[in-house]
Amino acid sequence: MLKLTYILCLVYILNGLSMDAQSLKIMTYNIRLDVPSDGENNWSNRKDFFSSQIQFYEPDIFGVQEAKPNQVTDIATALSQYNYLGIGRDGDGKGESSNIFYNKERFSVKETNTFWLSETPDIPSKGWDAAFNRVCTYALFKDLKTNKTFWVFNTHLDHMGEEAKTKGIQLILSKIKTLNSKNYPVIFMGDFNSEPNENRILELRSVMDDSKEVSEQKPYGPSGTFNNFKHDQPVTKLIDYIFISKNSDLKVKKYAVLSDAVDLKYPSDHLPIFVELKYK
């Protein structure tokens, strides 16, 4: 009887480990740049809660937007289990960046780069009618738990230029098509500064799956992601997304917008999106 109990326990543990290996937790997070004019919402007052939030949810990979060099350093120092990829929009170590942080024990990086959303994507540049330089950072990861390979693209589209937003998405999709000759699964995430009913998002949904729309479980949390640091108001403006390539080996099990706060203060003016994916 004891032997049977031992075997059953071992099977249960191994099954749990297998299920965990098949799961992939992804997060996108506009962390709000470090700017003194934010007053009580300055990064120095937010960074500890931000880091503790990441520690609690334990994403395997998370993409950030608006990260200034000092913020990237703070995150890397506080969350030493992650390595990060990506450079600033004004050049290496300059300006805001859209970094990809990944669990360094679970993943190896096969390929990575940062390009600019412009007519000259290989050099720091501002595209079309954009107000600022904008970038996309991407990486090809190998999951050391499963030996699966997949791409991650992380971006922050312009907040002003309508043409820049549309052509920025088109440029990224073109880059995905060029790079992904082996048809690996693709995760495309970030702050798109575009709401769900805008044509560019509708068109993107025709070629990739919006994780919110295809989640097996009912989406959790507020309907929007941009909170503007206003904890006393509903969050209804949705401008952040995680898209998954259609007909890929990844399925969306759970989707959530996380509205955690401490003392009625958010860790950013955006709420993060957290999804749990699973391999088919």
List each model region and its residues:
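N-terminal, active-site-proximal structural segment of metallo-dependent hydrolase catalytic domains
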Residues: L2, Y6, M19-A78, R89-E96, ...
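Bacterial N-terminal signal peptides
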Residues: Y6-G16
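Active-site-proximal beta-strand elements of phosphoester/diester hydrolases
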Residues: S23-V35, E111-F115, K148-L157, H270
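Acidic/histidine-rich helix-loop elements
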Residues: T28-D48, L117-A131, D158, Q233
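Active-site environment of divalent metal-dependent phosphoester hydrolases
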Residues: L33-P36, A67-T73, H159-G161, N193-N199, ...
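Structured beta-strand-rich core segments of catalytic domains in phosphoester-bond hydrolases
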Residues: I61-W151, K254-V257
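Active-site neighborhood of phospho(di)ester-bond hydrolases with catalytic His/Asp-centered motifs
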Residues: G63-Q65, G86-I87, I187-D191, D210-E213
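Metal-dependent phosphoester-hydrolase catalytic domains
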Residues: E163, K167, K177-V186, S194-K280
